[in-house]
Amino acid sequence: MEHNFKWKNDGRTKIMIGCGTRPEIIRLAAVIKRCREYFDCCVVYYNQNWDRNLSTVFWEDFELKNTFGEYGPDILVPVVGENLGVTCGNILGRSYELLSELQPEGYLVLGDTNSCLSAISAKRLHSPLFHMEAGNRCKDECLPEETNRRIVDVISDVNMCYSEFARKYLADTGVPKERTYQTGSPMAEVLHMNLEKIQKSDVLERLGLEKDKYILLSAHREENIDSEKNFLSLFTAINALAEKYDMPILYSCHPRSKHRLEKSGFQLDPRVRVNEPLGFNDYNKLQMNALAIVSDSGTLPEESSFYLSIGHPIAAVCIRTSTERPEALEAGDFILAGITTRELLNATDMAIEMKQKGVLGKPCPDYVDETVSMKVVRIIQGYVNVVNKMVWRKY
């Protein structure tokens, strides 16, 4: 595979980070910076999210520069094929080729995307494998991520989970407890790192919106978009929400979601404004000023907890029927709404009224720790040699 990356060979541990989607860039932002500070680091991007608004803009938002001094990863790997099988095959084949060539001393992945399946290549090549966001479970087999989670959890040498719930799920699968660590979520560190930029964003002025006079919408998950039944149920509910509140609903719309809407011919209420995907700082500024946030994003519970911790609660409504973040539900940081009209209207009414009355949950401790990147690099540094010696018997 053609690329220009070379290790610095400065004596530091050689760590490769594999990612392929917008959420991974966001969650790994502080960790990537910390790894570049303490390791000889190579960031590989498998380009699942190929649209500029879902990839390039985020490297810029977080000022993540590669070894060549440019915003972006060190190595960009095209993997998207004509179907899921080809894409996953490309991820496995091309990650195997890169790992074979560069031979990092450790490989780090986060989460549950198809790009995380590159972990299989690292395992087969005896590269110590570290997994952030390990142990997340929503117990819903309709989510493709649930399969990826189990695969990567079980084969990883060291699992780093967000919460005690996740640690328990890992233990239930038989993953060694002695190589499982609870680090907390990296999102608070990322949000704090960008809070000043978020607050300075002029996105409301650019979009002609006013504080508390719009609802922010994000709907992109496969189970909501690709299922005909769920798609119709959800967007019928969104139209009902627009009619009830009679204000703009700003839809940060992914390309595949937009394509699905166009292909279906579904007529959105005129008050639902379909917008291109927004950058991190703009989107969070919109979250901080919206009357309510209606989203199927996995980061919503963590963002809600963070904003609650800094005295700026948001009305967070999750348009899903399951969650892999029960600790945030337990803390009262968001409402799990479902995707029917009745469920969505009731949940949104409740979230808005509770916020206005100051009836709030409490910040989830796992979601407000701003030292996660430090923990991650220390764990990696400590276990690279242990895994090479005890698991792979390299010396």
PLM region spans:
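Active-site and donor-binding regions of nucleotide-sugar-utilizing enzymes
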Residues: 14-19, 24-34, 38, 58, ...
